[in-house]
Curated annotation (Swiss-Prot):
<protein>
    <recommendedName>
        <fullName>Putative lipopolysaccharide biosynthesis O-acetyl transferase WbbJ</fullName>
        <ecNumber>2.3.1.-</ecNumber>
    </recommendedName>
</protein>
<keyword id="KW-0448">Lipopolysaccharide biosynthesis</keyword>
<dbReference type="GO" id="GO:0009103">
    <property type="term" value="P:lipopolysaccharide biosynthetic process"/>
</dbReference>
<dbReference type="GO" id="GO:0005829">
    <property type="term" value="C:cytosol"/>
</dbReference>
<keyword id="KW-0677">Repeat</keyword>
<comment type="function">
    <text>Putative O-acetyltransferase that transfers an O-acetyl group to the O antigen.</text>
</comment>
<dbReference type="InterPro" id="IPR001451">
    <property type="entry name" value="Hexapep"/>
</dbReference>
<dbReference type="InterPro" id="IPR051159">
    <property type="entry name" value="Hexapeptide_acetyltransf"/>
</dbReference>
<keyword id="KW-0808">Transferase</keyword>
<dbReference type="Pfam" id="PF00132">
    <property type="entry name" value="Hexapep"/>
</dbReference>
<dbReference type="InterPro" id="IPR011004">
    <property type="entry name" value="Trimer_LpxA-like_sf"/>
</dbReference>
<comment type="similarity">
    <text>Belongs to the transferase hexapeptide repeat family.</text>
</comment>
<comment type="pathway">
    <text>Bacterial outer membrane biogenesis; lipopolysaccharide biosynthesis.</text>
</comment>
<dbReference type="GO" id="GO:0016746">
    <property type="term" value="F:acyltransferase activity"/>
</dbReference>
<keyword id="KW-0012">Acyltransferase</keyword>
Length: 196
C-alpha cells in the first residue's frame, strides 16, 4: 500500500500526505484528513463532522459569535474559503470543489436608510450585515462557486462552476449562472433529470 501511494503521489507528495495525516490525527481526530497549509481562525466555533476531508489552502473564519458546522463525510477541495459571523451549516455527504467562497455576511447593508453603507466609508469600516447560510445534504458545489448571505440550498442540489448563489434553492435541482438559476430538476417518477 505504501509503494502504491508513493507511486500515485510521487515522493514529495507522499511525504506531504504522511505529514498531513499525522497533523490531522493530532489536531482534528474525527477528520479523515486536512491538507496543510490551512488557515483556521476561531476554531472553537468550527465543528467538523466525522470523515471531514480538505484540500490545501482551506481557510475558515468564524468571527465573533460566528459558527461553521460541517456534518459527516463533507469533502472540500483546494483553496476553499468559508467566513461566518452568524452561521454556516453544511450537510452530510456534500462535495465542494476548489476555489469556492461561502459567506454569511456583507460589509454594509446597502439599504436606502443605512448611512454606514456609504461608498465614502471604507468597506472594512462599514457595519457588517449577516444572514445564515444552510447547505443541504448530498450537495455538489462546482469550481469557483460563490454562496452569498441568506442562501438556503436544498438536498441533492448541483451548482455549476462559476455560479453565484443567493436565495432559496429547491432540492434535487441543477443550478448555474450569475445569478444562479434552475436549469434542471430531478423527476423521482422517471428517475431522470429534466430541463426546467
Amino acid at each position: 500500500m505504501i509503494l502504491k501511494l508513493a507511486k500515485r503521489y510521487g515522493l514529495c507528495g507522499f511525504i506531504r500526505l504522511v505529514r498531513d495525516v499525522l497533523l490531522t490525527r493530532v489536531f482534528y481526530r474525527n477528520c479523515r484528513i486536512i491538507r496543510f497549509p490551512c488557515y483556521i481562525r476561531n476554531d472553537g466555533s468550527i465543528n467538523f463532522g466525522e470523515n471531514f476531508t480538505s484540500g490545501v489552502g482551506l481557510r475558515l473564519d468564524a468571527f465573533g459569535r460566528g459558527v461553521i458546522f460541517f456534518s459527516d463525510n463533507v469533502q472540500v477541495n483546494d483553496y476553499v474559503h468559508i467566513a461566518s459571523i452568524e452561521s454556516v451549516t453544511i450537510g452530510r455527504d456534500t462535495l465542494i470543489a476548489s476555489k469556492v467562497f461561502i459567506t454569511d455576511h456583507n460589509h454594509g447593508s446597502f439599504k436606502h436608510s443605512d448611512p454606514m453603507s456609504s461608498p465614502n466609508i471604507p468597506p472594512d469600516m462599514r457595519t457588517l450585515e449577516s444572514s445564515a447560510v444552510v447547505i443541504g445534504q448530498r450537495v455538489w458545489l462546482g469550481e469557483n462557486v460563490t454562496v452569498l448571505p441568506g442562501t438556503i440550498i436544498g438536498n441533492g442540489v448541483v451548482v455549476g462552476a462559476n455560479s453565484v448563489v443567493r436565495g432559496s434553492i429547491p432540492e434535487n435541482t441543477v443550478i448555474a449562472g450569475v445569478p444562479a438559476k434552475i436549469i434542471k430538476k430531478y423527476n423521482h417518477e422517471t428517475k431522470l433529470w429534466e430541463k426546467a
